[in-house]
UniProtKB/Swiss-Prot annotation:
Matching Pfam families: PH (PF00169)
Modification after translation: Phosphorylated in response to FGFR1 activation. Phosphorylated on tyrosine residue(s) by the epidermal growth factor receptor (EGFR) and the insulin receptor (INSR). Tyrosine phosphorylation of GAB1 mediates interaction with several proteins that contain SH2 domains. Phosphorylated on tyrosine residues by HCK upon IL6 signaling.
Phosphoserine PTM positions: S251, S253, S266, S304, S402, S454, S651, S683
UniProt-listed InterPro entries: Gab1-4-like, PH-like_dom_sf, PH_domain
Molecular function terms, GO-annotated: signaling adaptor activity
Name of the protein in its database record: GRB2-associated-binding protein 1
SUPFAM superfamilies: PH domain-like
Biased composition (Basic and acidic residues): 194-203, 672-684
Source organism phylogeny: Eukaryota, Metazoa, Chordata, Craniata, Vertebrata
Residues with PTM Phosphotyrosine: Y627, Y659
GO BP terms, alphabetized: signal transduction
Job description of the protein: Adapter protein that plays a role in intracellular signaling cascades triggered by activated receptor-type kinases. Plays a role in FGFR1 signaling. Probably involved in signaling by the epidermal growth factor receptor (EGFR) and the insulin receptor (INSR). Involved in the MET/HGF-signaling pathway.
Keyword annotations of the record: Acetylation, Phosphoprotein
Species in which this protein is naturally found: Mesocricetus auratus
């Protein structure tokens, strides 16, 4: 024991180190507070395993203490209603739990007396005491309102400066009745006056006390909203339940939703409330603005209804340009067809004296058959009619006048000499394209109908049948996907379609689209999945359970740094590490501190006397002695690394006999040495095998 005077002693529960707050238990220890003012010894706080132990587990130097906090809280079930205080030192914070509040206050007072600590300035107890007295005095501030109203309103409406100043009752009543009079009288008006009187007073009588109260409130908002309420509902007593008048936006929105007729001055509007009536005009203007806008919109909507719907690009050109007589009749008939083909129209005035057989006899070029992939229209030939003679034009357009068959799905003809009846209209138009190609244009120009610059072709795309034929080429190639074109019935390559230089090349299908989905090998039956790797965190566990924190009743004590400077760390304080409490797992953490191990000469001093054969002080010395024996006694014939492996156990030595030269005497000596140390025998029993090794 130290030689200081015992100031205080008792049982306290001590916390483990901060990094072990969650993993280790808070153990009950016997604490002794010693003062060395009379004896010259340092002021220390010692704790023992029990009250009759002779050697302390640890000595806390109070000269290194920085602060003491009392009344902490800890979010743990066993410490919910405990009395916790801490001793904050340079090395560590000790959290101590007392059995009662008196016991805690006694320990804190004694420690503060020895250390010379004073309460800190940021003590939260004083503001709590002042604030707790304020609501008690505030109900006596004003007695103009009922008791229930005053108790509810005074903590909110009174400024905080009046709560802090303690004045006599009568001057306090007079002083507080001037400034917050607006709010108090407004509440009184709500509670005292009945609904009919209140309604009539606000709309007709300007001399009543209630109206005078409203004059103090922003009156340019309240009368306008109340007037509109009166015009709609006939009473507005429920609106006055608000503490402050509603905003203009709220009143306008309510009026516009309920108001049907323009406002007038038929209500009893007072001359005093002229700003309110002025604002009513402003609200009338605001209200009429949406109605005017809606009337304009209604007119525009009426115009848009009478006006036809804007036509689609296919319906833009309803009357083609200068066409022959047959062309005009045929194109005007086709232009009126909507997007979905209607029933077959009546026969035109031109006679259909052409049969499908005559169509097959018309001369064709090699690329003529490729034109079957384009839907012919009446608008395509006129753009090229300047290159055709008059006789051929009349003949060919008589053939084109019989183009009225869109009901049969078109298929690719297997033979050039025979075609279906549904192809007779296409074949006749192909004759036009064939004659046009003779006039100096290439055979690949048969795909010129895909040019989007031709207006009749844009129109013709509006009544085509892209659903019935997948190989259909639209007249606007900008929106057509050539990757899917010709996948079902591809055109022959010898007809020149694929080799056409002006036809966009077919985009190859991406390989990623054809790949199968990835295989989930975890779905195989009887598959042994690898276990997920364990997430080993360094030391985050102590962060999950926070240390005891400050509470509203926490009191902090610290010394004045100007009057009591911190003394340097003494070297003789931490010399009591070893004790009879060797099984205390939390205290085994203390010698791992580098400062303690370097300053304590008796910790490992006995090991160096006998060359590692002294009595065991800590079980940590096993590895040190074992590695010293292996390093110093490694034979010359074998490297030290293999000698270590051979000495790790009998099984390892037996395995390496086949290919490593092993000294049997050294192997047995190392084996017996290891068994002696692991069994916890005395050093005298292990001296014989150790010397035999040497």
């Amino acid at each position: 024991m130290s030689g200081g005077e015992v100031v205080c002693s008792g049982w306290l529960r001590k916390s483990p180190p901060e990094k072990k707050l969650k993993r280790y238990a808070w153990k009950r220890r016997w604490f002794v507070l010693r003062s060395g003012r009379l004896t010259g010894d340092p002021d220390v706080l010692e704790y023992y395993k029990n009250d009759h132990a002779k050697k302390p587990i640890r000595i806390i130097d109070l000269n290194l203490c920085q602060q003491v906090d009392a009344g902490l809280t800890f979010n743990k079930k066993e410490f919910e209603n405990s009395y916790i205080f801490d001793i904050n030192t340079i090395d560590r914070i000790f959290y101590l739990v007392a059995d009662s509040e008196e016991d805690m206050n006694k320990w804190v007072r004694c420690i503060c007396d020895i250390c010379g600590f004073n309460p800190t300035e940021e003590d939260p107890v004083k503001p709590l005491g002042n604030s707790s007295q304020a609501p008690v005095d505030s109900p006596f501030a004003g007695n103009t309102a009922p008791a229930s109203t005053q108790l509810e309103a005074s903590p909110v409406t009174l400024p905080p400066s009046y709560q802090l100043i303690s004045l006599p009752p009568h001057p306090d009543t007079l002083g507080l009745q001037d400034d917050p009079q607006d709010y108090l009288l407004l509440i009184n008006c709500q509670s005292k006056k009945p609904e009919p009187t209140r309604t009539h007073a606000d709309s007709a009588k300007p001399t009543s006390s209630e109206t005078d109260c409203n004059d103090n409130v922003p009156s340019h908002k309240t009368p306008a909203s109340s007037q509109s309420k009166h015009g709609v509902n006939g009473f507005f007593q429920q609106q006055m339940l608000y503490d402050c008048p509603p905003s203009r936006a709220a009143s306008v929105s309510v009026d516009s939703s309920l108001y049907n007729l323009p406002r007038s001055y038929s209500h009893d509007v007072l001359p005093k409330e002229s700003p309110s009536s002025t604002e009513a005009d402003g609200q009338l203007y605001i209200f009429n603005t949406p109605s005017g806008t809606s009337s304009v919109e209604a007119q525009m909507r009426h115009v848009s209804i009478s006006y036809d719907i804007p036509p689609t690009p296919g319906n833009t050109y309803q009357i083609p340009r200068t066409f022959p007589e047959g062309t005009l009749g045929q194109s005007s008939k086709l232009d009126t067809i909507p997007d979905i083909p209607p029933p077959r129209p009546p026969k035109p005035h031109l006679t259909h004296d052409r049969s499908p057989v005559e169509t097959c006899g018309a001369p064709r070029t090699a690329s003529d058959t490729d034109s079957s992939y384009c839907v012919p229209t009446a608008g395509m030939p006129p753009s090229r009619s300047n290159t055709i003679s008059t006789v051929d034009l009349n003949k060919l357009w008589k053939d084109a006048s019989s183009q009225d068959c869109y009901d049969i799905p078109r298929t690719f003809p297997s033979d050039r000499s025979s075609s279906l009846e549904g192809f007779h209209n296409q074949s006749k138009i192909k004759n036009v394209l064939t004659v046009a190609s003779v006039s100096g244009e290439e055979p690949d120009e048969n795909y010129v109908p895909m040019n989007p610059n031709s207006p009749p072709r844009q129109h013709s795309s509006s009544f085509t049948e892209p659903i019935q034929e997948p190989n259909y080429v639209p007249m606007t190639p900008g929106t057509f996907d050539f990757s899917s074109f010709g996948m079902q019935v591809p055109p022959p390559a010898h007809l020149g379609f694929r080799s056409s230089p002006k036809t966009p090349p077919r985009r190859p299908v991406p390989v990623a689209d054809c790949e199968p989905p990835p295989v989930d090998r975890n779905l195989k039956p009887d598959r042994k999945a690898k276990p997920a790797p364990l997430e080993i965190k360094p030391l985050p566990e102590w962060e999950e359970l926070q240390a005891p924190v400050r509470s509203p009743i926490t009191r902090s004590f610290a010394r004045d740094s100007s009057r009591f400077p911190l003394s340097p760390r003494p070297n003789s304080v931490h010399s009591t590490t070893s004790s009879s409490d060797s099984h205390d797992s939390e205290e085994n953490y203390v010698p791992m501190n580098p400062n303690l191990s370097s300053e304590d000469p008796n910790l490992f001093g006995s090991n160096s006397l006998d060359g590692g054969s002294s009595s065991m002080i800590k079980p940590k010395g096993d590895k040190q002695v074992e590695y010293l024996d292996l390093d110093l006694d490694s034979g010359k014939s074998t490297p030290p690394r293999k000698q270590k492996n051979s000495g790790s156990g009998s099984s390892m030595a037996d395995e390496r006999v086949d290919y490593v030269v092993v000294d049997q005497q050294k192997t047995l000596a190392l084996k017996s040495t290891r068994e002696a140390w692991t069994d916890g025998r005395q050093s005298t029993e292990s001296e014989t095998p150790t010397k035999s090794v040497k």
